Amino acid sequence: MVGSSEAGGEAWRGRYYRLEEVQKHNNSQSTWIIVHHRIYDITKFLDEHPGGEEVLREQAGGDATENFEDVGHSTDARALSETFIIGELHPDDRPKLQKPAETLITTVQSNSSSWSNWVIPAIAAIIVALMYRSYMSE
């Protein structure tokens, strides 16, 4: 269902937008973002955003939930954001926003030579022995 461009109030309740529609609104003439599955038309707010227009435009047409929460917006900022809601992301599109958990993969090079495992300690032992001998001869 296509929603109206009227932002704010409770008029947005029950208005759903498909992800493809939201993704089209990614420019300075029409800037929409998704935060917690709600669609915000922030076009008129770009110039007023305390963090600058660029941070909002980077998120335009996509899910800005993580960035919104990471910044730690004030209660006033959260209340102000409510005035820009125009609808919700269609329930069928919500799984598309789920990001896979990041996995840290550590690899060990199997071609590390075994000579370095004994040569380096052997050289260190020789240096220590020479230093000890030099110290004892004084």
Swiss-Prot record:
Single GO MF descriptor: metal ion binding
Chief location category: endoplasmic reticulum
Residues spanning the membrane: 114-136
A Pfam family it matches: Cyt-b5
Membrane topology recorded in Swiss-Prot or TrEMBL: Single-pass membrane protein
Xref: InterPro entries: Cyt_B5-like_heme/steroid-bd, Cyt_B5-like_heme/steroid_sf, Cyt_B5_heme-BS, Cytochrome_b5
Cited function: Cytochrome b5 is a membrane-bound hemoprotein functioning as an electron carrier for several membrane-bound oxygenases.
Descriptive protein name: Cytochrome b5
Species of origin: Gallus gallus
